[in-house]
From Swiss-Prot:
Lineage: Bacteria, Bacillati, Actinomycetota, Actinomycetes, Mycobacteriales
Its job: Catalyzes the ATP-dependent condensation of GlcN-Ins and L-cysteine to form L-Cys-GlcN-Ins.
Record's subunit section: Monomer.
InterPro entries in the record: Cys-tRNA/MSH_ligase, Mycothiol_ligase_MshC, Rossmann-like_a/b/a_fold, tRNA-synt_1_cat_dom, tRNAsynth_Ia_anticodon-bd
Annotated protein name in UniProt: L-cysteine:1D-myo-inositol 2-amino-2-deoxy-alpha-D-glucopyranoside ligase
Keywords: ATP-binding, Ligase, Metal-binding, Nucleotide-binding, Zinc
Amino acid sequence: MQSWSSAPVPIVPGRGPELRLYDTADRQVRPVAPGNTATMYVCGITPYDATHLGHAATYLAFDLIHRLWLDLGHEVRYVQNVTDVDDPLFERADRDGVDWRDLAAQEVALFREDMAALRVLSPHDYVGATEAVAEIIELVEKLLASGAAYVLDGEHPDVYYRSDATLQFGYESGYDRDTMLGLFEQRGGDPGRPGKNDALDALLWRAARPGEPSWPSPFGPGRPGWHIECAAIALSRVGSGLDVQGGGSDLIFPHHEFTAAHAECVTGERRFARHYVHAGMIGWDGHKMSKSRGNLVLVSGLRAEGVNPAAVRLGLLAGHYRADRFWSQQVLDEAVGRLQRWRAATTLPAGPDAAAVVARVRQYLADDLNTPKAIAALDGWATDALDYGGHDEVAPRLVASTIDALLGVDL
């Protein structure tokens, strides 16, 4: 699947400290230590509606990781999927009277436009689930052969994963069984499905039903389940031992827990990823922004209103990536004002020495992506530059390059 074009990333002189991130599984901030090539898998959209600010905030968080790795001199192998075969997509296409493939293509195209406008660096591999069916089938075959999966008896011989197939199941979320069952039911699971060995067993392959797309397989025609898609795409593109697996905090369970379990079951490794990283939710009108609730602020809508995407990006980065937070007109207005001040300061013929502020920005971002502190440091430099001037002719350009390279904001 085609990705989007990325703007060049400036090279900033010097080097910052190694990146440290909060790991959901270990419940602590600890160093990320990739090799020459850093690897990251981030779950993509289900393309049945336009990109809202909750999506945008998630992809901006992982864009910061991408940028910090580049700043440290790493090559980056970044993989993102598109869940272009799933019930919500079929339901929306049926409601609107369109072909599900056409709807998916339309929304993926809009997503690309939004990501390019927000200056999110494109993934190395951008893969639709429909493009990875062969890899998914191969992974399901391995799980069946090992006894980690089974075929349900009855009219619809669906394939399920045994949730007890790995001893470490549950380590990523740390949730107790009751919490898991509740979230499983809320987030696409089927704990009440008759015939399953355990209520928490997860669907790997849905046997063909009338009116649904299907693909041939050794275990019968059908289509992939949700979690197995990401496991197969990640393993086939970058293998096990990812440096970072990421997404929104609403994916911790069941999606990321099962994705890791599927992969660990076939590789025999203790952890699918070295770091599990999750972004907080963005709220609007008193609730988490979500397609199902309909309380959405769309990136494309803001762009259509003439809002500068750089201000949207800066507004979302003003809060810490792990924090649940609300979007508002005030957040946008503050971002617009900050953008104007930064532009004014970085277009001066000279300014205060920039070495210290560049070092602080690197330090704060390396400390679990502390964008509020990084932005405050830049605010301080801009205020000094505008109020008192300076004699360093290189400083304004250096600060502008730092903001571009590390925060992704083009002044």
